[in-house]
A protein has these predicted regions:
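C-terminal transmembrane helix pair
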Residues: 100-104, 108, 112-121, 216-305
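Cytoplasmic-side transmembrane-helix entry/capping segments in multi-pass membrane proteins
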Residues: 39-53, 102-110, 159-171, 218-227
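Entry/N-cap segments of selected transmembrane alpha helices
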Residues: 11-17, 30-64, 115, 179-210, ...
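Hydrophobic transmembrane alpha-helices of secondary-active transporters
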Residues: 1, 9-43, 143-153, 162-187, ...
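Structural signature of hydrophobic alpha-helical transmembrane segments
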Residues: 8-24, 70-85, 130-144, 189-201, ...
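Juxtamembrane helix-boundary/capping and inter-helix hinge elements in multi-pass membrane proteins
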Residues: 30-42, 66-75, 84-106, 125-130, ...
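Transmembrane alpha-helices that form the ion-translocation and gating core
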Residues: 45-86, 192-244, 268-278
Length: 305
């Protein structure tokens, strides 16, 4: 109640989610470099596509089987909102540890899955939600403007990329102010389940697909098996565009918040394990250069059978 006194206090700590999400998207867009090298863009686009279709596919499947009630309390809004959105900070850290410069550079492309844009596309395509074109455009325009400014002025890019780290705590505060303790406690099991589902679909499964496409075992395919903290604000943004989702916002947000913590713990451990396994696998089968790629595909297929 203390946060409802109005003015700047209410605006920042209670009703600030739309503004903070827009600012986060603006900063994210500024980090995308139009001059990025081909390998960086290739990896970034591929990982973004795998993340989106993984979340879209599992969300569509669960909705078709269990309907709006969800699977073991997991709502379709929470599943799609979480699984399609990766934690860029964790990915960048893992890329710096187990990848190369192009993997680190792909982080900027992965920022495209920040915010509600892909979730709206997935829910709308699946027929689960109805979003006016203006709402869809409004969810991506801040990122586009940030992209333009970041590429016109590199100093602004550096400033805005640094500012991204300041925003998640404020997002979390606004989000928590709209939840009850019982909702958070009740999301415990389903939130853990959502986190493990995210790791399974966009961690383990994407590692296999990414490695087959790359024609060598590549642990970075599993590094997108996370849920970004900002994803917890996606249900509120979705409900603003389609009020029919309003009853699901509180529960979905709590589930996504719990999944964020689970994936932040599990995914780095998974990537560390897969990095060791991949190194041994690639050395065993002589992978790593173009002349050996076809052999590598056959070897990976044989290893997984």
């Amino acid at each position: 109640e203390a946060l409802k006194i109005g003015g700047f206090t209410t605006g920042l700590f209670k009703n600030g989610i739309p503004t903070l999400i827009g600012l986060y998207l603006f900063c994210s867009g500024a980090t995308i470099d139009v001059k990025a090298a081909g390998e960086t863009v290739y990896k970034g686009v591929l990982l973004t596509a795998l993340k989106f279709f993984g979340g879209f596919g599992i969300g569509l499947l669960l909705n078709a089987i269990f309907g709006e009630a969800g699977f073991l309390g997991l709502l379709p809004l929470a599943v799609i909102g979480a699984v399609t959105n990766s934690n860029g900070v964790i990915y960048a850290t893992l890329a710096g540890e187990y990848g190369d410069e192009s993997d680190v550079g792909a982080t900027a492309i992965l920022t495209l899955n920040d915010g509600p844009f892909f979730t709206m596309i997935a829910l709308g395509t699946a027929g689960i939600g109805k979003f006016p074109i203006t709402a869809i455009m409004a969810s991506i325009i801040p990122l586009i403007i940030g992209f333009i400014i970041g590429n016109l002025d590199h100093e602004w890019r550096e400033t805005l990329s640094t500012a991204m780290a300041l925003l998640p705590p404020f997002n979390g505060f606004c989000l928590g102010a709209g939840m009850s303790f019982f909702t958070i406690a009740g999301a415990g099991f389903s939130g853990i389940l959502l986190g493990l589902l995210t790791v399974a679909v966009t961690g383990i499964l994407t590692f296999i697909i990414y490695s087959l496409i790359r024609r060598k075992a590549d642990p970075m395919g599993a590094a997108i098996g996370t849920v970004a903290g900002v994803a917890a604000t996606t249900p509120a943004a979705i409900a603003d565009a389609d009020p029919s989702f309003a009853p699901q916002v509180e529960t979905s947000s709590a589930q996504i918040a719990a999944a964020t913590i689970v994936t932040a713990i599990v995914t780095p451990l998974l990537v560390a394990f897969l990095a060791r396994w991949s190194r041994k696998f690639n050395e065993k089968h002589g992978l790593g250069n173009a002349k050996q790629q076809n052999t590598g595909v056959k070897a990976m297929m044989a290893e997984t059978e």
